[in-house]
Amino acid sequence: MTKILGSDPVKRGMAQMQKGGVIMDVVNAEQARIAEAAGAVAVMALERVPSDIRAAGGVARMANTTIVREVMEAVSIPVMAKARIGHIVEARVLEAMGVDYIDESEVLTPADEEFHLLKSDYTVPFVCGCRDLGEALRRIGEGASMLRTKGEPGTGNVVEAVRHLRKVNAQLRKVINMSHDELMTEAKYLGAPFELLLQIKTLGKLPVVNFAAGGIATPADAALMMELGADGVFVGSGIFKSENPEKFAKAIVQATTHYQDYDLIARLSADLGEPMRGVEISELAVQDRMQERGW
């Protein structure tokens, strides 16, 4: 069967090629080159990393197209970029620019509080965040080709990413072990398409890859998420807000690849300098929690 450009198999296949790797947020060409040299499988081009977006407040939008273009020209690995939830034109602009992936991201200020993008209408593949299986399947139903935990971006605190990944995986196990006649009721409970639950039961897993994101700040954090079953990791502020970005980037890539080699992770964690400053989640007001954006 001929594979059609923009079809689900093609778009999901692109995400499969990133499996086991690290995707790093970058704000300029120099950072993109550091990420590529460290072994990142892709970079996410944006104007400000999540911790700076959080600190600045106000409205966070799609990155200036000049930044996205400079990053695309600087590296040979895939380049992703963020669009606001529901912002059709930002997504179309990024698609026209030729980015490899679009992240419909809660890190940016949502443009639409009711509707997410219909991602199946685009040729470019999308990645979306999720906190549970219901969110995951709603995004896949809209056409997402890749998932990531929402976590709590820009905090350097991995606890929410752990919570979200564990919840998705627990709900997956529940669905896989259900009888077929129970799936429709579970679909109603989750607010998710029945056909996707049936697909999960048949496959024994999600139909797309699910990376960990939101608060990953150290090599041990990255290894933890892989240990818990993530297909790879996104690192936002954790690298370029650390004391030594080059060393942190290389160490996180190695820890992700060799996540059960604890002696290696111990060596990688030595003499790295200070990681990014962390934020306690309980100190954040609900309206300041990016994970609450979208549904």
Swiss-Prot record:
Class of the enzyme per the UniProt entry, highest EC level: lyase
Catalytic residues in the record: 82
Protein name: Pyridoxal 5'-phosphate synthase subunit PdxS
Lineage, uppermost ranks: Bacteria, Pseudomonadati, Pseudomonadota, Gammaproteobacteria, Pasteurellales
Organism: Actinobacillus pleuropneumoniae serotype 7 (strain AP76)
Pathway: Cofactor biosynthesis; pyridoxal 5'-phosphate biosynthesis
Protein EC: 4.3.3.6
Transmembrane segments: none
Family: Belongs to the PdxS/SNZ family.
